[in-house]
């Protein structure tokens, strides 16, 4: 870990806190997610690492490596300087249809790539959609903690995700197609970009999760009169927000929809852009590191001594000056099975 120095805190998420770091040799910036060793290294963490490392696409945050400190597991990944798409919408209120399409095209490109590798995300939302720092921002999907691989796992049947984005079939305890559920979540993202509000929240009581779930189950939504949305876009949304997953539009059909194809960037016709190769760490190395991280730790404080840096005070990861904030719980990410009382 000695090769990285900490620049600043950049937030907290489902499993830990994140820091912006700089590679001392290349000067490249990376984001590092720190997860406390021991019980917090659960199946979600392992799934996130193993699925994320296999994904190499311009619209997905690039996984670099996983490392151990004395007290934490550290996930090193690409840094998205543009922040969350959520923040951009909060600042703008809502996007024009052209701007919403620009971001939606990239989102679908990244999700389609995941699905081509039999990986469904299962927690797609604006907060998990980052932007790079370029003038025409590139979408970067992140946070694969809830993702499920069709190669490694059976069809998902657990109720996970964020209530506002969750598909009707996910609310049941039966198996469902995670890819089709991802389509629904992409539709919610598109709607929020266009309208500046969630499609299934009751405008008079947006915090009532039971009302939200009731509207989701009925696919009950409306586009406000004050928002100008083309008929083509309305048609696409109506094909996404279909309660029966068997009748819902697929990613492939979205890619061929007339609204989606308008102003489609050339590189999306030609396939993925050239990207850096996969992590240099082997699967065996990563599995060993994860298993080590699961073992109870005996170190009493901080990140001191990680990577053998001992008591250095230069701000490098693992130095004794390192101070991690307490992990925050993301209360938006809840098991909605707890909400399923009679409507």
UniProtKB/Swiss-Prot annotation:
Its EC number is 2.7.11.1. SMART domains: S_TKc. The modification Phosphothreonine is found at residue 158. Keywords: ATP-binding, Kinase, Nucleotide-binding, Phosphoprotein, Serine/threonine-protein kinase, Transferase. It is an enzyme of class 2 (transferase). The keyword Nucleotide-binding applies. Gene3D superfamilies: Phosphorylase Kinase, domain 1, Transferase(Phosphotransferase) domain 1. It catalyses: L-seryl-[protein] + ATP = O-phospho-L-seryl-[protein] + ADP + H(+); L-threonyl-[protein] + ATP = O-phospho-L-threonyl-[protein] + ADP + H(+). Residues 4-260 form the Protein kinase domain. The keyword Transmembrane helix does not apply. Expressed in seedlings. ATP binds at residues 10-18, 33. Disulfide bonds: none annotated. It comes from the Eukaryota. Induction: By abscisic acid (ABA), cold, H(2)O(2), salt, and osmotic stress (at protein level). The active site is at 123 (proton acceptor). GO terms for cellular component: cytoplasm; nucleus. GO terms for biological process: response to osmotic stress. GO terms for molecular function: ATP binding; protein serine kinase activity; protein serine/threonine kinase activity. Involved in gene regulation and confers tolerance to drought and osmotic stress. Belongs to the protein kinase superfamily. Ser/Thr protein kinase family. This is Serine/threonine-protein kinase SRK2C. It comes from Arabidopsis thaliana.
